[in-house]
């Protein structure tokens, strides 16, 4: 009996030793990234402080609400949105930039990774999302694109022949 207890204690200590670096990594990630967890149906079950900060909603305001709360109405009504959740429920992950709505109504861009979590019977039991606010980067890129487009539209193009005469203006 005592030998079995010693063996279990040793196994437990070994597992704790393996788990420690994972806990440290998770803690580091939680301090800098936004985390949110959903049911397979899209109901919010957990958020971290970073997610609340990025969206403007407190955890109490988010938990129990559907993912739709964070999306534009036109997106929610789209077939693309239904397909997005269908793919997640089929166990397919998603990574990319997504447009979401802040509590005050302004647009926020997130670099998001959605991970379906499965049980031992291969059923999706929850969806885990890790996100980073990239709004400033996306808006800066769009501003640059608009500026370059305006320059392209306003530039004059003049063609000359070999003698310097204008052939097309």
Which functions belong to the PLM regions below?
Residues 2, 9-12, 120-121, 125-153:
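Sensory coupling linkers of modular signal transduction proteins
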Residues 16-47, 142-169:
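Sensory modules in modular signal-transduction proteins
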Residues 32-35, 77, 87-97, 111, ...:
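PAS/PAS-like sensory domains
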Residues 45, 89, 94, 99-108, 118-119, 167:
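PAS-family sensory domains
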Residues 51-63:
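PAS/PAS-like sensory domain cap-loop motif
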Residues 63-75:
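PAS-family sensory/regulatory domains
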Residues 112-114, 131:
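Sensory-domain boundary capping and coupling elements
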């Amino acid at each position: 009996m005592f030998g079995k207890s010693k063996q279990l204690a040793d196994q437990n200590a070994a597992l704790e030793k393996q788990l420690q670096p994972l806990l440290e990594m998770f803690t580091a990630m939680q301090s800098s990234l936004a985390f949110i967890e959903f049911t397979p149906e899209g109901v919010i079950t957990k958020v971290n402080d970073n997610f609340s900060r990025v969206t403007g909603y407190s955890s109490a305001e988010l938990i129990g609400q559907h993912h739709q709360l964070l999306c534009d109405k036109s997106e929610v009504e789209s077939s693309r949105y239904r397909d997005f959740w269908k793919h997640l429920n089929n166990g397919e992950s998603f990574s990319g930039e997504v447009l979401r709505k802040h509590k005050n109504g302004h647009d926020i861009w997130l670099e998001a990774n959605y991970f379906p979590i499965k049980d031992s019977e291969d059923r999706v039991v929850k969806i885990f999302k890790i996100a980073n606010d990239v709004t400033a980067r996306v808006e800066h890129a769009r501003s640059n694109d608009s500026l370059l487009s305006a320059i392209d539209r306003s530039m004059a193009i003049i063609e000359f022949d070999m003698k310097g005469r204008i052939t097309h203006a």
